[in-house]
Amino acid sequence: MDKEERKTINKGQEDEMEIHGYNLCRWKLAMVFVGVICTGGFLLLLLYWLPEWRVKATCVRAAVKDCEVVLLRTTDEFRVWFCAKIHFLPVENQPNLNAKCLVNEVSNGHAVHLTEENRCEMNKYSQSQSQQMRYFTHHSIRYFWNDAIHNFDFLKGLDEGVSCASLYEKHSAGLTQGMHAYRKLIYGVNEIAVKVPSVFKLLIKEVLNPFYIFQLFSVILWSVDEYYYYALAIVIMSVVSIISSLYSIRKQYVMLHDMVATHSTVRVSVCRENEEIEEIFSTDLVPGDVMIIPLNGTVMPCDAVLINGTCIVNESMLTGESVPVTKTNLPNPSVDVKGMGEEQYSPETHKRHTLFCGTTVIQTRFYTGELVKAIVVRTGFSTSKGQLVRSILYPKPTDFKLYRDAYLFLLCLVVVAGIGFIYTIINSILNEKEVQEIIIKSLDIITITVPPALPAAMTAGIVYAQRRLKKVGIFCISPQRINICGQLNLVCFDKTGTLTEDGLDLWGIQRVENTRFLLPEDNVCSEMLVKSQFVACMATCHSLTKIEGVLSGDPLDLKMFEAIGWILEEATEEETALHNRIMPTVVRPSKQLLPEPTTAGNQEMELFELPAIYEIGIVRQFPFSSALQRMSVVARTLGEKRMDAYMKGAPEVVASLCKPETVPVDFEKVLEDYTKQGFRVIALAHRKLESKLTWHKVQHISRDAIENNMDFMGLIIMQNKLKQETPAVLEDLHKANIRTVMVTGDNMLTAVSVARDCGMILPQDKVIIAEALPPKDGKVAKINWHYTDSLSQCSESSAIDSEAIPIKLAHDSLEDLEVTRYHFAMNGKSFSVILEHFQDLVPKLMLHGTVFARMAPDQKTQLVEALQNVDYFVGMCGDGANDCGALKRAHGGISLSELEASVASPFTSKTPSISCVPNLIREGRAALMTSFCVFKFMALYSIIQYFSVTLLYSILSNLGDFQFLFIDLAIILVVVFTMSLNPAWKELVAQRPPSGLISGALLFSVLSQIVISVGFQSLGFFWVKQYKVCDPNSDVCNTTRSACWNSSHLYNGTELDSCKIQNYENTTVFFISSFQYLTVAVAFSKGKPFRQPCYKNYFFVISVIILYVFILFIMLHPVASVDQVLEIMCVPYQWRIYMLIIVLINAFVSITVEESVDRWGKCCLSWALSCRKKTPKAKYMYLAQELRFDPEWPPKPQTTTEAKAVVKENGSCQIITIA
């Protein structure tokens, strides 16, 4: 029964959840109803806040298949609970549909993949006789009951389980009206519905927050106790806070709604049966619809795969990359000579053929009168944009030690409040107080201990940091991440466009003739090369297009095309329509590049002497793919009968697709020489196609059929200069003990060279290349280790002295750990093999891995996860194009983009410079330290006021209404919001701020200040009780309050109620505690090394000085009107001097102790803990400690690590030295 009751959905995915079934129980509902009435509605609030309690209190367990309510719990570390109600989708009254078949198909997960004719074949799999489909909705996704797996499953589109061949064979003709209605019923409306909630709904949701409920409780309590002014002040603060919060939340909803509204309802044309064209609203699109992309472009309302034509698309909304991308039709496997017809379609794998929702189609091109068509594969929230919007609407909780410790500390305050609560009750009973007064005073102590302003105070530093970041061009869509960025100790950088200049300069070319490399050439515009195949490849093999008359495309393509000085011409819409066929993009050399024509000696022969027009038409394009690391085109030279195929890409990849006899024997050596110097090398290849290959066939031929048996033509050498600020920024990060890692799609040796040039790898450091090979022909996976400095000498020397690779920490403290003097480098393929077959080597490689080359987008994400698994706080800085996954996964992802905000990254820098990284870390550290300072101050504020009230309760007195008001508003709020204004320190330092409140130094700081404050308050309180009052005539106020002079005569039951407030003890405690708030604020307002000194925070300094002067003035020179408002008793002048002495000594001791804790506290704790050899908490630090004494690490050159074939689960391995 337990297996039936608890199942798992989205297994293996990020949003994996456990699911439990429940049915409503009437008697439980009745009990809850009674409980709500008895608790005055508090039980209802509790059940609203805790969904698991709500379900368990009102329901009984049931089988998931038959339940009415499901209880969901995430399986990650947060264990968040959700509940959802089961809904039924009625199908009995739907025309043109077989209701029973429909239920069975959905129940078995075949809603899309079956054609209309064979739907009823699924009857035999169904176990349900119901004419209704059961489903629930969670985070905007529908989950239907699936009989095949006996579980709920989300409804898939054509993005899973559909082959490329099936897309052409079964889905390219479009849907019938009946099938469209069938799918519309199941998938619902195609929209990313971001409804902007009404102000009333937002208000109710905000007010029901536990924090505001607690404030409401406090206000009611204070009103009953006649603390009207303070209650009114809290109400005003709460109203302002709620209005501000409502404005911010509603603004975010409106922005998100506007972002998706551009394509929410547009008219689109779709293909129907018998080649009919129907115009429908985009909200009616379903997976399987064949959509026609208009000539003048559109904003895509869904995810669709191109099956006809070509599109130029702007994907900046998704990736942050503003360069237009060319999308071509999905290769038709029916003509695939390699028999790859069963390849499964995937939007990620085939993204160069997929139009994603929300992206803008700028231009389209079609062939021989055929329309540009795309099959809808995903709709609504299942689309790529829908998933991004879901991640914004339903963000994953942020796991940060500071917040966990904050909740723990609040719990401690609740315990302290409980002690005060019990003490107040006992003390009041002993003094025979009325029941009503006992209840009010006891509850009041709770509202004092847990400060209402704590959440607002904690977020102040983050808000100010966000403003400062915006001033330097860094925009943030996840403010809570700013604090986390203060903990970053490793940053991954993309190379091209991030560490190096975005544009590449053409250094030169090196052609191949007769399988030999010619000398390098720097002039590609020479007359001799104009009509060469090499230049023809440079002129045609690109994805450039003209947008509004301006050549646009990939920066590398632009540089290459500009270097040869050719002209690109595209057909206009009118020309295309006139010829009723595709007009290819044509490239031709400018007139000055062509050879001079021969002068005719005879006027009659002049016609024959004119130079022939030389131009090339680009017939078909296979765009660049990060996974394939190449692109190719099919082109035809004017006048030629046969077409040509041109290819460019990574040299290793291009060479592998060429005839071996055309690749020079010294290819690897020449390539290595260039890459070691940091050049970006691109290889070119060419092939004459068969004459039988017609224009029409080319449009449907597969990529693999073209990209093989090519002739190697040579290399293009591009110079990728470092950005001017790169070395300085990396040096700053290294000084701050922040590791830097390069993650790039470029060549390995080029990446290593750039890493050396920018200072990521020092000149004396060793670089070890890990070349991992997957299992093959019965052999296990293995890793070959090479040293880059000794690659050419490997055969001569089989080993290197281990002392040549010193393995020592750069600092004595593990907290200042820096990667030691060797670095690992590997490519994407090796990284994947290591992840799969060498799991126990992964942490070691993460500790010293510095260069990761030829990395695909998903591999970048896996690398970030692997680094996080060894407890690094990882930052990721990239250009946003191929780094979206890694940017989202990292603790702090920074996209270098001109866009003000990007949904792909928590942070976006408007200026494309990595100088934003230290700026972000500095601001993160400042915000983190501000949070610590504010939290410590608010803790002391609570304890000081709690102890003040407890002392006064012992003599049945209390602080006055306006005294509370003055402390909480004039002192606390002013101090909190000004002490958070300290800007970040001007440079990064090696020391890192603590990650949580539960650390020795912080706890000792708070506890010591509590002891000091409590001690001096007690001193003043008990001293004044013993103080003998002088003759009434000595009172400088010349008042006759003899009844209130001596606390021993205060409360005999006949005095006025005002005497409970206006007494020596109250006045003494009020003045001492008021100064204590200011003293701990100054003591806790830390400056260097993370924030500017507090004396540069002018608002804070001025506020503290004004408050100090004002309190000192009314203490030493009483003002009757102020004394009356604050209910202060005018005490003798001598006692004021005594109070001044207490206050001054208190300030001196507090500040001295805090400074001592700052300077020597950490050292003392480290010394104390070193006696018991404390194990480092972070995994990478513990691992570094182990590796210091491992004689087998790092692996020596020319050795091989083989995976054990027997045990594959734990990835265990053995090192075998090859002689």
From Swiss-Prot:
GO terms for cellular component: early endosome membrane; late endosome membrane; recycling endosome membrane. The modification Phosphoserine is found at S813. CDD domains: P-type_ATPase_cation. GO terms for molecular function: ABC-type putrescine transporter activity; ATP binding; ATP hydrolysis activity; ATPase-coupled monoatomic cation transmembrane transporter activity; metal ion binding; P-type ion transporter activity; P-type transmembrane transporter activity. Keywords: ATP-binding, Endosome, Magnesium, Membrane, Metal-binding, Nucleotide-binding, Phosphoprotein, Translocase, Transmembrane, Transmembrane helix. It comes from the Eukaryota. It is found in: Recycling endosome membrane; Early endosome membrane; Late endosome membrane. It is a multi-pass membrane protein. SUPFAM superfamilies: Calcium ATPase, transduction domain A (SSF81653), Calcium ATPase, transmembrane domain M (SSF81665), HAD-like (SSF56784), Metal cation-transporting ATPase, ATP-binding domain N (SSF81660). Mg(2+) binds at D494, T496, D879, D883. This is Polyamine-transporting ATPase 13A3. Residues 223-228, 427-444, 958, 1017-1066, 1120-1136 are lumenal. Expression is greatest in liver, followed by kidney, colon, stomach, brain and small intestine. Isoform 1 is highly expressed in the kidney while isoform 2 is highly expressed in the brain.
